[in-house]
Structures are given as structure tokens and as C-alpha cells.
Amino acid sequence: MSDLPFTLDQLKIIKTIHREGSFKTAAKKLYISQPAVSRQVQNLERQLNTPIFYRDKRKARLTETGHILVKYAEQILSLCEETCQALDELKSINSGTLVIGASQTTGTYLMPRLIGIFRHKYPQISIELKVHSTRRISWGVANGEIDLAIVGGEVPPELQGTLEIISYAEDELALIIPQAHPFATLQSIQKEDLYRLRFIALDTQSTIRSVIENTLTQSGIDSRYFKIEMELNSIEAIKNAVQSGLGAAFVSVSAISKELELGILHWAKIEDVTIKRTLSILINPKRYYANPIKNFEKEIMEILLTSAASTNNP
């Protein structure tokens, strides 16, 4: 390819003239003389062999060539700024701020441990953890508000072609009941017994609830006929409600390990029914990721994959 007919300085000048509307104002904005601005434009017009501006006393207006030039000048200069930012971030490989997203269960029971391990290795990196529904977190990653996320459940269909979804493990959902419930004496219950229970449920927008309903439907159980006593948006609140004898609930096994160990809650196994959801890491492939984010992704992938392997091969 032959030498380019323009320089970055010339593109910046053309862009500024178009934005400010005159050579004089552009010169002031760029802290150079007006003759220097005019000379650069003339040199570029001579190089391209076509005018870039219609010149009149009121305003510098772009020609068709000028419009094309400004359009690509904005993209080129933006990429140059992004390149400079990336190079600057190389100097601070182990510092910066990460915004990590997580759905309710992963944010409450998994992320604190992962963040603790990461912060021990990279103490200079600040981490902001946002815990919301899978849908809200997914949109946060897509919009650039969240750098990386770990979620359970299905990513919104409209984002599945936009985000990179790295599935790393399955999370089993358990039916929990109070220790004093008659079903707690049984080795397992029949799926039809679910209609006899009173349920404490997550709100209808929860991905956990969707997974439960879909799995039960495939097993011939219509959850629309369940007795829903109340809906809560907190796993801890649901566990406390079940412990208090207010009903039964489906929650992630990872959220009840302590309660099962202490005998506070009972995991009621359902014969011929196993409910699982996929845990995934979400990133936006269109974004530039600085080193702190790359480091975090690498570290948690190693931890999560190792943990998943040990769980599947006890």
C-alpha cells in the first residue's frame, strides 16, 4: 500500500473545523495559528486533488469529499485514543478497578470466596460487586456497565448472540423443607407430593424459577397448581421462612451446605426428578479488556474449573 495522503494532525484539524464551523475557531481550539490551519487544509486538498470545504464568510461547509473524510477521521482518531489507553494500562498491569456482576445465589455464596482469593494475589485491584437477577446482570455486561459476570440460569435470548457465554458447571437445586415436616422422615418423596406442599418462591422474573418450572413440566408436574404462600427476592429470606415452618422452597445446593450440616433444614429428594441449572461466565467480546479484568477472568476460570472437576469426580 502506498503512503497515506493525510496525517493524523490533518484529520484532527478537519474534524475540528467541521465541529467548530470556522478555521479561526478551530485554530483557537487546537492552540495553533489560523495560517497553520489553512496551510494544512490546503496541503491535504492538494494531495487529494479535490476541495474539502466550501469557503464562504459565514461558515466552512464540507464538500462530499469532506463528509467522507470527517466520517472516517472520527473513527480513526477514536481508535488512536483507544490504542493510547490500552498502552497506558500496560503500565498498571496489577492495578485498577473491576466491576463484577453476579446473580443472587452466585453473588451471595460463590463470589465472596473468589474475590477473596483474587484480592490476596492482587491487593492493588479494587473490586465492585453488583448482585442482581441474571437478566439485569446480562444487560449490564452487554451495555459495558459490568466488566465480567458469573450467573446461574439462562441468559436472555436477545443477548445470547451478543455475549460470550462460558459454561463451566451445573448447579443442582434442592427442595428444602423444615426438619419438623412429615416428609423429612422419608428417604424421598413422589413428584405428585409437591402439590401437597406450600411454597416460598422467588419472584416470577427469577431464572431459578424458570429452570424449576421447565424441569417439572418435563417431568409431568404443572407448577401452576402449586400453593404459593409468598414470593421473596432473597435466598436468605427464603431459607429463614422455610426454617420457620412457613413452607417449602427450591434453592441452590450451594446455598444450604451450612444448614444441612447443622440439621436446620432438610433436603427432600424427589423420586426420578433432578433439577439442575448451568453456571456461566459472561463477557462482552466487543469490548477491550484491560489487564486487571483478564487477570480476574484467568484466576476465576482456574478456580471454577478445578472446583467443578472435583465436584464431578469425588
UniProtKB/Swiss-Prot annotation:
Please list the GO terms describing molecular function: DNA-binding transcription factor activity; transcription cis-regulatory region binding
- For this UniProt entry, what's an example GO CC term? chloroplast
Q: Which Gene3D superfamilies match?
A: 3.40.190.290, Winged helix-like DNA-binding domain superfamily/Winged helix DNA-binding domain
> Which InterPro entries does UniProt cross-reference here?
LysR_subst-bd, Tscrpt_reg_HTH_LysR, WH-like_DNA-bd_sf, WH_DNA-bd_sf
Q: Which UniProt keywords apply?
A: Chloroplast, DNA-binding, Plastid, Transcription, Transcription regulation
Signal peptide limits:
none
As for subcellular location, the record says:
Plastid, Chloroplast
Q: Which Pfam families match?
A: HTH_1 (PF00126), LysR_substrate (PF03466)
Family statement: Belongs to the LysR transcriptional regulatory family.
**Role, per record:** Trans-acting transcriptional regulator of RuBisCO genes (rbcL and rbcS) expression.
What protein name does the entry list? Probable RuBisCO transcriptional regulator
**Species in which this protein is naturally found:** Emiliania huxleyi (Coccolithophore)
Designated gene of the protein = rbcR
